[in-house]
């Protein structure tokens, strides 16, 4: 039986692997390079999960999609041969663009998907 890994969550599970696959296919990267990207992404997700939250139900889409996008950015820089400092810069630039999204709840847990809340 295969396992499905939601990285970082089920609601954002297509962001990171989709971005990684697109880059890997475009640049014809080998499997070990892609694995290194996934390892870098797992470290990024681990830091966020231990210091903040990754659940959209708690932190809104900034937490869920933001973490996934940061994981993707870091993974791609790693796959392209970037330094750890460059990976960090990619994460920071990605997160800066996702902070303060207006769709997130001001004081609490969301009760429905963004489309329903903003619809």
Q: Which positions does each model-derived feature cover?
A:
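Glycine/charged-rich beta-loop-alpha catalytic/anionic-binding loops adjacent to active sites
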Residues: 1-5, 48-58, 106-110
């Amino acid at each position: 039986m295969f396992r499905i890994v939601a990285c970082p969550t089920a609601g954002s599970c297509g962001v990171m692997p989709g971005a990684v696959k697109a880059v890997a296919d475009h640049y014809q990267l080998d499997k070990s390079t892609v694995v290194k990207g996934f390892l870098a992404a797992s470290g990024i997700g681990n830091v966020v999960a231990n210091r903040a939250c990754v659940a959209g139900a708690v932190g809104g889409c900034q937490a869920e999609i933001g973490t996934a996008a940061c994981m993707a950015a870091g993974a791609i820089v790693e796959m392209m041969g970037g330094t750890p400092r460059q990976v960090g810069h990619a994460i920071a630039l990605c997160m800066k663009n996702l902070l303060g999204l207006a769709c997130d709840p001001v004081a609490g847990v969301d009760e429905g998907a963004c489309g329903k809340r903003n619809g």
